Every structure is written in structure tokens, then in C-alpha cells.
């Protein structure tokens, strides 16, 4: 065959006609090389992802500033009610009229872009109401006081909050731990509504109730992966000896008509209690757990400080301040400055290795 081809080549131009098998092998090897190169490039891109900035993929990337919404208040102020004592069992102040606000609550609010005015519960009622006129929302903290003057002041402030919302002003309230418990007592009109639970100094999950609608609630802007983490990881801090079981909560018409249950949790003995509620008709959210501790308290080893736990704290703080920005209250700036928390200095109490790291003490 070779001789015939060579011989023919002497007489005329030779054309090479490869066999089909040869063509198949050539194409197959070429395809393998192409695919190999392609997947190598994909692997390299995945190992070192190229993060494109907006100017790299937007044709018109000329900068433009987002217009301010004139309906929103971009200087919101939150009032935090002080609690009896010094927050350290008398180690920092044994004054009989002492009250305190843990600095973690202040930082919690400030981290979301608001300022704080302390509402000192022992002040005359007219002074407390004057301070309410300077703020765009209120936070009731954790603690132990469930009777006497403190209970009475919480009740009166809560009534004012509802009145302002009924009058058309958006005026949010957060109630944490003790705040949750006192609100439950006030709304249910039952001082004995609470039940004992074994949930002191422990981290836990949050279990969302079946078919719950989180639209408009504190959880609305949580990313899906974080909602899942709340149900699978112990990333919220619990520290309470009382609470309300879902059954008792639902049986009380006043409570169930005012609040919807968003989440439940289990105590050490696996008893289920209501852990997060949202008012049906008001911007009022109550937590049996402590959203402020994950980022701002270090006194106990069981406080979760993972990235997910810190993210929970930030989202919860953002929701409160987002609601406060909707408040139509625009108090005089100088009046706010005269009452703002910056007029006070926090006291470091963390040297004992337990309790609050910092507290604001008022006497």
C-alpha cells in the first residue's frame, strides 16, 4: 500500500484520506483535552473565587446616594427602664434606692444605630412620662422584681405605649426575660400565671411553632440558614426560673388574643415553655431568652459567642431600631442630650468573674 501511494505521488499531487477510526480517535482525544482544561479552570475559580465589584458588571456604575425617607426618624432613641439594685448583689452599691441598667442592653441598642435614655424607675411618675416623650421605643430588661413600685411602673409605661400606638404613632417595645414575665402577668390579669422552669444559665435552641408566619416579626429578616441554626444549635442564652407553658398560654384568652407564639424552648428537664411572642396588633415583642448577651456579656462560659450567635443578637437589635425609626416623635435635640446615657459612666463589675460585665448605677 505504501509503495502504491509513493509511486502515485511521483505522477501527481497526493491527497491523504484518513480512515474513520483515525478521525474518531483524534476527535475523542481533543475533547478530553478541552474538558480537562475546562474543569481545571473551574476548580481554580472555585478555590480562588473572583469577587466582581459592581463597576465590573454594571454598565452604568455612576454613583448615586440613596434618598432619605422623610417619614423615618434617623436619630431614634430607646428608653431602657432601670431595675432595682446594683446588678451585683450589693457588691457595687448598697444604696437602698439604687437601680441599674446593664451596659449590655445599652450596647445592644447602640449597635443597631440608636441612642439610649435611661428611665429610672424610682423617679417621680411625671419625670418618667417626660422621658417617654423623648424616646421612640422602650426596652424592659431582665431581672427579678415582680411586685411593688417596679411592677407598678412597668404597668403604667406599658399602658402609655399602647395608648401611643392606638393614637397612630409607631412606638415599639422589647421585653426581655423578666420583662416577658411581667407583661404576661399584666396582660393575663393573673399574677400567678407563671410556672416554674429549670432554665438557669443555659444555652438552648428556639423551636418555631407549626405554620408560624414570621412576616412582620423580629425573625422576618433572618436569613434562612440562621433560622435553621436557631432550631438546631444552642445559640440563644436562657437564664430564668419561671415561664409559661404553651398550653397555659393558649388557655388564657387575654394572652392568646394579644400575643402570638413564635417559638418555644425546652428547659433542662425537657419541659416546654414559650420563648418568643409577638403582639398581633402592636409592635411589641417579648423574649424569655436574652438576645443581648451573645455579643456583650462574658461572665458565664455557657453564653454562646459563635458567629451565628452574634448574628442573632445583631438581627434582633436591628428589628427594634428599625421599628423605632418609624416613630413620628421628634423631641427637641437639647432635651434628648440632657437625658441621654452619655451623661452617666458605667461601672466595671466583671472582676468577680460572674454577673454583668458593666452596669450603669443610678442613686
What are these regions (language model features)?
Residues 2-282, 291-363:
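N-terminal beta1-alpha1 cap of cysteine-dependent amidohydrolase-like domains
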Residues 286-287:
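Active-site regions of oxyanion-processing enzymes, predominantly non-cytosolic
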Amino acid at each position: 500500500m505504501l509503495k502504491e501511494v509513493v509511486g502515485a505521488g511521483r505522477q501527481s499531487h497526493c491527497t491523504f484520506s484518513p480512515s474513520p477510526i483515525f478521525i474518531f480517535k483524534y476527535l475523542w482525544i481533543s475533547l478530553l483535552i478541552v474538558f480537562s482544561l475546562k474543569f481545571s479552570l473551574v476548580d481554580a475559580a472555585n478555590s480562588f473565587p473572583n469577587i466582581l465589584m459592581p463597576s465590573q458588571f454594571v454598565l452604568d456604575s455612576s454613583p448615586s446616594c440613596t434618598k432619605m425617607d422623610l417619614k423615618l426618624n434617623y436619630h431614634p432613641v430607646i428608653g431602657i427602664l432601670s431595675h432595682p439594685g446594683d446588678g451585683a448583689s450589693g457588691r457595687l452599691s448598697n444604696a437602698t434606692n439604687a437601680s441599674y441598667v446593664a451596659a449590655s442592653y445599652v450596647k445592644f441598642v447602640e449597635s443597631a444605630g440608636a441612642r439610649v435614655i435611661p428611665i429610672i424607675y424610682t423617679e417621680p411618675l411625671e419625670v418618667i412620662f417626660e422621658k417617654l416623650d423623648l424616646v421612640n421605643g422602650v426596652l424592659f430588661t431582665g431581672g427579678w422584681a415582680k411586685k411593688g413600685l417596679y411592677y407598678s411602673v412597668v404597668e403604667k409605661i406599658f399602658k402609655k405605649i399602647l395608648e401611643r400606638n392606638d393614637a397612630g404613632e409607631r412606638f415599639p417595645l422589647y421585653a426581655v426575660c423578666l420583662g416577658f414575665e411581667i407583661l404576661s402577668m399584666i396582660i393575663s390579669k393573673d399574677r400567678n400565671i407563671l410556672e416554674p422552669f429549670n432554665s438557669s444559665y443555659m444555652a438552648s435552641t428556639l423551636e418555631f411553632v407549626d405554620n408560624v408566619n414570621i412576616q412582620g416579626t423580629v425573625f422576618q429578616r433572618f436569613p434562612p440558614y440562621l433560622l435553621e441554626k436557631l432550631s438546631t444549635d444552642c445559640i440563644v442564652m436562657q437564664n430564668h426560673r419561671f415561664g409559661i407553658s404553651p398550653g397555659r398560654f393558649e388557655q388564657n384568652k387575654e394572652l392568646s388574643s394579644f400575643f402570638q407564639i413564635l417559638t418555644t424552648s425546652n428547659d433542662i428537664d425537657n419541659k416546654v415553655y414559650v420563648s418568643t411572642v409577638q403582639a398581633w396588633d402592636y409592635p411589641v415583642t417579648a423574649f424569655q431568652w436574652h438576645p443581648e448577651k451573645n455579643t456583650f456579656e462574658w461572665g458565664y462560659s455557657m453564653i454562646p459567642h459563635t458567629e451565628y450567635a452574634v448574628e442573632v443578637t445583631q438581627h434582633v437589635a436591628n428589628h427594634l431600631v428599625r421599628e423605632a425609626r418609624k416613630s413620628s416623635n421628634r423631641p427637641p435635640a437639647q432635651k434628648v442630650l440632657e437625658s441621654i446615657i452619655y451623661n452617666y459612666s458605667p461601672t466595671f463589675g466583671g472582676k468577680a468573674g460572674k454577673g454583668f460585665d458593666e452596669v450603669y448605677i443610678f442613686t
